[in-house]
UniProtKB/Swiss-Prot annotation:
BP GO annotations: symbiont entry into host cell
Keywords of the record: Capsid protein, Host-virus interaction, Viral genome ejection through host cell envelope, Viral penetration into host cytoplasm, Virion, Virus entry into host cell
Summary of the function given for this chain in its UniProt record: Probably triggers with protein G the injection of the phage DNA into the host upon conformational changes induced by virus-host receptor interaction.
Species in which this protein is naturally found: Spiroplasma virus 4
Family, similarity comment: Belongs to the microviridae H protein family.
Protein name in UniProt: Minor spike protein H
Source species taxonomy: Viruses, Monodnaviria, Sangervirae, Phixviricota, Malgrandaviricetes
UniProt entry tagged with the keyword Translocase: no
Subcellular locations according to the entry: Virion
Length: 133
């Protein structure tokens, strides 16, 4: 059960990382929108000067448009959680296959093959959970 708990912890860590990245992206977005809003008249003046129009003659006629920021969508944590959930599911299925094979007294080669597959899966999950940290 150790690797399984590790996967659950890694999934939670992935969700927390994804949430943190989403919050950071949202802050950058708000800062961008504020910068654009705060400089809209200055940008309009530069545009008018570049077009050869006297900005004072156009005073009060409008400002440069302020682009809207992007919409945040955090999928990093949910992708890791989904991947680790699939790995946990596969690990439990391999464990069940091993138990079934032992109960049915299959040949030792079949049990060994299932054990090898399970051990490889455990190593992969441990490696993946270390990368997430």
């Amino acid at each position: 059960m150790g690797p399984l708990l590790g996967m659950v912890g890694a999934g939670a860590a992935g969700s927390a990382i994804g949430e943190g990245l989403g919050m950071l992206r949202d802050k950058w977005n708000r800062d961008f929108q504020e910068r654009m809003s705060n400089t809209q008249y200055q940008r309009a003046r530069k545009d008018m000067e570049a077009a050869g129009i006297n900005p004072l003659a156009q005073f009060g006629s409008g400002q440069a448009s302020s682009p809207s920021g992007g919409v945040s969508g955090s999928s990093f944590g949910s992708n890791i959680t989904s991947m680790l959930g699939s790995s946990a599911n596969m690990l439990m299925q391999l464990s069940k296959l091993k138990e079934d094979a032992e109960r049915a007294n299959f040949g030792s080669k079949t049990v060994q093959t299932i054990n090898d597959a399970r051990n490889n899966m455990v190593r992969s999950v441990i490696t993946l959970s270390k990368r997430v940290k």
